[in-house]
């Protein structure tokens, strides 16, 4: 039976579509899915064009490669490859509806795997350097195969081995793989490890719980202290604003007080200035008045000097009393003598008319009375003398200011003898 299967395998062996060879260590496919030998596939992959027929050879050269892989790594890699093959077989079985092919204990699957491990009597090792590329092999499970024929072949071979098939309702044996029961010691060890893990998790949970409680406490304290701090800050700001307001109020009052003081001082200065102006005006007016009095005094001595001479001739006894007064007047009056000479040189007279009026007013009463009795001739002499000193009156006024009090003081006695003269005559 096995020989017939191998014969069927040989008849279905593929050939290269480019060079028509059937002896190659590895089969490849092009972009269109056509089967190529290893040489044609590599040439097409490297050069991008089909391999020419002139390069075809029937001798396959093999290079000797020494495997330096460690035994333990080789075993692990082999186990991984077997597991991968089993997964691929399971996937193909699911696609084709083959349930019995998924079981690794199925002898038909094992026989199929064993038949796939040889090509033309040469074992195919997946660890060989030829299979390093990702190009699929003809017998690689990645290449789609007509599973209907294979399933028929396997169905024919299974009864010959006498292996009973697994019933669909049979449960898997607990002795297979991971379903084996654990011993008491293993259970105790697993329980102890779980308890240790639980205790560790509890400790970690307590730590997290304590940290969380601490954070909550700090947050509560911070939230409780924030209003107090804010209130304290607001109070401090209010106090500072109140102090600033009081200070500004004091400064305002002080400025008002200074303003009032300055106003009072200004009023006082204005009053003083007004008084000074009034005093100056009064002094100026007094100077004019004194000058007029001086002019009157200057005009009167001539009349007085003339008047006592007549009573002396008539009545010598009463005329001796007013003699000292004219002497005092005569001492002050000699100054106007040089004035007429300097007057034309310095400046013209300002206004002689008011002086003449004032000088003429006191003259008629005292001078006219004695002249009627004795001599009318001297009266025109007094009138003629009056206009002479008037031009120099304004200029001589400053020189005569110290003598003004004497004239004012001497004015009463001057009038007295003039009045007594008519009494004596009467």
Swiss-Prot record:
Biased composition (Polar residues): 128-138
Gene3D superfamilies found in the cross-reference section: Erythroid Transcription Factor GATA-1, subunit A
Bias (Low complexity) ranges: 104-113, 306-318, 354-419
Source organism, top-level taxon: Eukaryota
Protein name, per record: GATA type zinc finger protein asd-4
Organism: Neurospora crassa (strain ATCC 24698 / 74-OR23-1A / CBS 708.71 / DSM 1257 / FGSC 987)
Composition bias type Pro residues, residue spans: 335-353
Statement: the UniProt record of this protein carries the keyword Metal-binding: yes
Pfam annotation, one family: Asd-4
PANTHER family per the UniProt record, alphabetical: GATA-TYPE DOMAIN-CONTAINING PROTEIN (PTHR10071:SF338), TRANSCRIPTION FACTOR GATA FAMILY MEMBER (PTHR10071)
GO MF, any single term: zinc ion binding
Location(s) in or outside the cell: Nucleus
CDD domains linked: ZnF_GATA
GO cellular component terms listed in the entry, alphabetical order: nucleus
């Amino acid at each position: 039976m096995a020989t017939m299967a191998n014969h069927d395998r040989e008849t279905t062996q593929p050939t290269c579509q480019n060079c028509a060879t059937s002896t190659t260590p590895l089969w490849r496919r092009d972009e269109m899915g056509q089967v190529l030998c290893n040489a044609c596939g590599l040439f097409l992959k490297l050069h991008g064009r089909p391999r020419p027929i002139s390069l075809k050879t029937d001798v396959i050269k093999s290079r000797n490669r020494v495997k330096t892989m460690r035994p333990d790594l080789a075993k692990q890699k082999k186990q991984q490859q077997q597991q991968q093959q089993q997964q691929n077989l399971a996937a193909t079985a699911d696609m084709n509806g083959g349930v019995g092919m998924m079981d690794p204990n199925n002898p038909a699957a094992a026989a199929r795997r064993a038949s796939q491990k040889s090509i033309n009597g040469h074992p195919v090792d997946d660890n060989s350097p030829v299979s390093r590329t990702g190009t699929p092999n003809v017998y690689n499970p990645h290449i789609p195969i007509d599973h209907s024929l294979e399933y028929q072949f396997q169905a024919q071979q299974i009864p010959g081995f006498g292996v009973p098939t697994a019933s669909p309702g049979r449960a898997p044996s607990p002795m297979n793989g991971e379903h084996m029961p654990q011993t008491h010691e293993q259970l105790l060890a697993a329980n102890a490890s779980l308890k240790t893990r639980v205790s560790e998790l509890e400790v970690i949970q307590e730590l997290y719980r304590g940290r969380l409680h601490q954070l909550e406490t700090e947050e509560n304290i911070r939230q409780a202290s924030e209003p107090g701090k804010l209130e304290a800050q607001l109070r401090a700001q209010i106090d500072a604003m109140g102090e600033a307001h009081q200070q500004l109020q004091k400064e305002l009052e002080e400025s008002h007080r200074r303003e009032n003081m300055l106003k009072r001082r200004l009023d006082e200065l204005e009053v003083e200035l007004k008084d000074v102006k009034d005093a100056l005006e009064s002094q100026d007016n007094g100077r004019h008045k004194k000058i007029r009095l001086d002019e009157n005094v200057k005009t009167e001595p001539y009349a007085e000097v003339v008047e006592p001479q007549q009573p002396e001739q008539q009545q010598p006894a009463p005329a001796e009393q007013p003699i000292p007064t004219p002497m005092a007047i005569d001492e002050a009056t000699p100054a106007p003598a040089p004035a007429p000479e300097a007057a034309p040189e310095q400046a013209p007279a300002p206004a002689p008319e008011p002086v003449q009026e004032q000088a003429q007013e006191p003259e008629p009463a005292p001078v006219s009375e004695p002249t009627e009795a004795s001599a009318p001739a001297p009266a025109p002499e007094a009138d003629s003398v009056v206009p002479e000193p008037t031009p120099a009156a304004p200029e001589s006024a400053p020189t005569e200011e110290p003598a003004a009090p004497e004239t004012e003081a001497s004015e009463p006695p001057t009038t007295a003898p003039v009045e007594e003269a008519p009494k004596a005559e009467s």
